[in-house]
């Protein structure tokens, strides 16, 4: 049976827009008259099937490269009657659950793009349409891809089939292609000539009326919400990404271990240098990332891969290999080991996020998010991607600390002289389900050809003794300069005055303080300076020592009352941290931070600023947790790093730290429990879900009587409880109009909960009830209007029904798009927080330590306009001092 020419023209328009375009790796198959009858991919297996159908085994020998100007549309237009459609015959089919022969009419020349495979359902129907309905069916076919879009739900596809059966009754008994289902990705696929994907299940439906029965029986079922799209493959591959196929990837830990081992060796011998060069040349594998491949065992969060062909690590590796090849020839034997270690240091620094602004580290989630290449079989895996990105951030932060320890640890003399390096494993594992034709192959390049070697004029041999003498003289001059600086610049001293603790600047010896000699002290703003202590009286002075160091630090003169106040506050803070008095910490954090700032002004070497930063961060994190119900792992990781630094400085913590308290409260949050239970109930079907939602509302009402709920807990309780009761009211309502209004209200409440909790929950009961009510209303209105109507009126009514269903489908598409936008925004915000938060935390700690180590704040003591010492407590809510931004930094003076 030939297809109606009008319908065929409509399909040609659809194929131009939604079929996979011909590319350079596709082949054309011609018949005995050299007329094209099919286009196939280079790895397609349908040629044998086509040969069996046409009973012409010579077709397999008639493959020729497709001309660049020939595509699917031109094939159809050139010879629409030269076998454009073929009967693809399987030896057995599972239509209807039984095994029997079934001839199915389908396209041999087209494959639909990812997400539009549902169009294959209409191809067999096109042969059964009567001529009177040809124009209507053509319009139906042309409008459907724009109406449903890519990856519609199964319920939307079945609703369209119901509408098609109503408009075109002759297709009710028509066969449909096999519909496959993947239980792992929760995705349907309407198969084409390529057949059923491996390990996929078969849907028991072989004709249109069986699909309509499935639509009626599946109302409210969860699988009705699963997407219908193409078989699993990557949605697209950018031409700019082709370099990843040949790039070398090596496991991060393997490369780190190789470089750490290299720092322990001696490179005075030629064999040792060759061994390191060979190890670097053989490190890494190609084809780790390809068009059909994404990292072996890509979902293991502990496996992170390093791209050795991306800057900055590629540049440092090239410099290291060039030095091992020819660069060492200009150096003395005694200097080669040191220079090799310096090059290895630079390579290691590029692997640390603490030293390098960019990172070459990838896992599957980071690669997909950065390049926007998503695996279709894992439709909607944003939550898993967030977890993998979070694991990558924690891994890089942890390894940055490990690399820093390696750089510090490898300053000892070299003791090994004969070394064979640790080479990474022979080949990475390939997880099941990945294409077997894309196997990673190790790079085995010869050292002399691995890196281009530049021909340069080597400089003359350097004089070792001359360089040693210059170094000794430089060290002596530096020591003299440091001693002179320390002798001329004296530390600030704070002394008791009659009205206020003024800052005193001494310009002479200590005896000048009592004799009136020297430069004296600065004048007060309104008159004479306060009187000095009477001669002969002795003022007790104490020295604030740096608790972070075992050596004696700069002594600071404080009056007894001020020191007593500071010491009491500091001991209170230490006691609160040791006993984990979380309530006291939150209540007094502002006052304690103010005191710690003042203590940092008195002694910049002590870790008072670090402690103030920790207390301020704990307060802000806990406040944010109470308001939003969320605290990221990266934030907690930054607090754990600060706690380790404070322990090293002598601050003792008890069995449970404030960070662990926040972590425990987040894990035991009532809102988290309600959210988890709500997501579980949303997956239930039928009356069980309604009863479970009512029970959840009762549980929430009981727990809301507790007095320790956060603001976010109260908001979550109110939202979830209201929705649970709304669903129960809908189930008890019998009036269709009232029920539809309640469904609209409950759907809005559901979207609000998704926005608040960051979920993507859709209760099947609400969507099923809405579809049922609208379908009934349309059918009742159509039945009333058709009685005694003319054919033109019936056609207009059918078009109106189609417009109603199209409007309903568009509304569901908009709802799904809004949910995807919310999920994408949440994912992007989470990525920014998880990537930037730990890096900023480490950077702030490093900048603050460097700033105070250089005595930045003490420079205020030598400025004549220095006001008063902030000894008294500041007002509550005063922002803490931050390096390079606070009022104490010299760049901010006016």
Swiss-Prot record:
Any one GO BP annotation for this protein: proteolysis
Sequence ranges assigned to domain Peptidase C6 in this UniProt record: 109-229
Post-translational modification: The viral RNA2 of bymoviruses is expressed as a single polyprotein which undergoes post-translational proteolytic processing resulting in the production of at least two individual proteins. The HC-pro cleaves its C-terminus autocatalytically (Potential).
Gene Ontology MF, one: structural molecule activity
Gene3D superfamilies assigned to the protein according to its UniProt record, in alphabetical order: Helper component proteinase, Tobacco mosaic virus-like, coat protein
Residues flagged as site, Cleavage: 229-230
Similarity comment: Belongs to the bymoviruses polyprotein 2 family.
Name of the molecule in the record: Genome polyprotein 2
Lineage, highest ranks first: Viruses, Riboviria, Orthornavirae, Pisuviricota, Stelpaviricetes
Gene: RNA2
